[in-house]
Every structure is written in C-alpha cells, then in structure tokens.
Amino acid sequence: MIRFAPALAAAATCALATPAFAQQTDVSDPLPTGEEATVFDGDFLSVGVGVGYNPSYSGSDDYNVNVLPIVQGSVWGVDINPRPAGLALDLIPDAAEGVSFSAGPMVRLRNDRVDAEDINDDVVAAYGELDRAVEVGGSVGVKFPQVLNPFDSLSFTLDATWDVAGAHDGRTISPSVTYFTPVSRATAASLSFSTSFVDDDFADYYYSVPATNAALPAEDVLPGFDAEGGMQSYGFNLLLAHDLSGDLTDGGLSLVGIAGWTKLVDDAADSPFTSIRGDNDQYLVALGVGYTF
C-alpha cells in the first residue's frame, strides 16, 4: 500500500476538488522512525472538514465555496484513499522496504452541473441540469521512497473509471505523479502533477452545446459545438500540512492548506461553456482541519 501523511492532507485535496481537479493523492507514512511506534503503523482513521473555493462547474470562471467532510484511513490492512466525491481502496500490502505498489477498486460521484442553483452563470444554467454520474473502476500505483532525502517519496498513480448510472456513459483515465517530503517533524508538503483523458461520450455530455436554445434570447444563445474525446486537462496541486502537536507521526489535529491550478485543453477548452462563458484556467484554494487516531 502507498501511504501519505497526515492522511487528512490527501483527503482534503480530493474532497474539495471540482471535476477539473480530479487529483489523486494516496496515503503515505510521514517519517520513517525505525522501531518508534506511529499512529500509522496499524489501523487508523482521519476525519475532518474542509472549506474550498473552486469553479462552479468545469470550465467556469465563477467560483463557489463548498464545505465538505473528509475521511481517510487504513482498516484491516486495506487503505481507504479519497477521490473527488469518492473512494479508492488499496489492497496490496506494503513492501518492508524499497518500492511499494498499490491497486484496488474505486468509485466516485461526478456532480458537475447537477444543480442549476450552483451554476453561477445564467446562460450556462439555461442549458439545463445534468445527471449525477456514478463512476466505477480501478486505481493502480507505484511509490519510490528516498528520492532526495531519507523521508521523501515519488508516487505514480493511474485511475480509470466508467459511468454506470447512465449519465455520460463514458470513460475517464487520470494519471498523476506526486512528490512528498516532510519539511520538519511537524510539517509536510507535496506537489502533484495530474492529467485527465476522456472518451467521446464524456466529452459530448459535458462540453457539447446544442445549436438552439428556446430558453434564451437569440443574442445569448451559444454557438453549437460537438465535443470529442481526448485530453481534458492538466494541472498542479501544492499541499502543506501541519500537525498541531508538533509531530506528524502521533496523530491528533492537523491543518491543511491547498492551492491548485488546472488547464482545460482541447475540446474542454474550446467548448463555448468554457471559451465564451468561462475560462480554461481553473483555480482551487482550500483549508482543512481534521483529527487522526
């Protein structure tokens, strides 16, 4: 299993993410301490709450504030890792030392434009609400420890999901790479780079625009657009986590700050929902607090 600590940090990244910020971050022990016991040695659970400021839909230049619960942990040898509005399970035991692997099932909800009241653009809202997608698939990863110092790691993760709820009926593939390092005994940081690729069904559902719309005056109707699959986005997330007890390894209360930028590309950027009514530069700022035990 691949672990990241404090666990709240990864949970906050994913729980506060919009569809454009489908960032993967897995759990990782913060500081190898030899024989010294840590809260992450056996079963543990992290719970908390986060507040995020993020786009009102994928491609929007209007932003909403969201308050979301956070949960992550390891139970009976199975890591529970957050995904945006979902979870991924890691079923592979950690290697005693050296390279570690992760693999397991995942499920997530996609809530993009499902509620017109959350779309802060009257023109986009006039094109109607979308159905909530339920995406099921799997996640695999590999972690290389001690890259630049004895306590850091470099992780590669790949998520693939398919909608099973009859919303977009499509597929997403999301590779990411994360560098994690403790800054001190109390503070850790990670920098992640991620990309996302979607198929034609996904792109058509979220980014195509019909040529007519009777709900809008003629001057507000957007030009018709037929979106096709391909690369949807790439971006970076920077995360800082600070344990309030001064020791990342003993659990307790932690504070987490996240800043992220995502660039929509290809048809996700060319869609009038983005190019006319929104912006292909998407930003995320989030703060979280939680308790690990």
PLM segments and residue spans:
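Residues that define the transmembrane beta-barrel architecture of outer-membrane proteins
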Residues: 43, 63-69, 99, 130-136, ...
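Outer-membrane beta-barrel transmembrane domain signature
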Residues: 142-146, 164-174, 178-254, 261-269, ...
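Short loop/turn motifs that connect adjacent beta-strands in outer-membrane beta-barrel proteins
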Residues: 32-43, 59, 78-101, 145-153, ...
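Residues on the lipid-exposed face of transmembrane beta-strands in outer-membrane beta-barrel proteins
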Residues: 49-53, 69-75, 87-93, 105, ...
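Cleavable N-terminal export/targeting peptides
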Residues: 1-40, 60
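Transmembrane beta-strand segments that form the barrel wall of outer-membrane beta-barrel proteins
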Residues: 47-55, 78-89, 123-125, 153-164
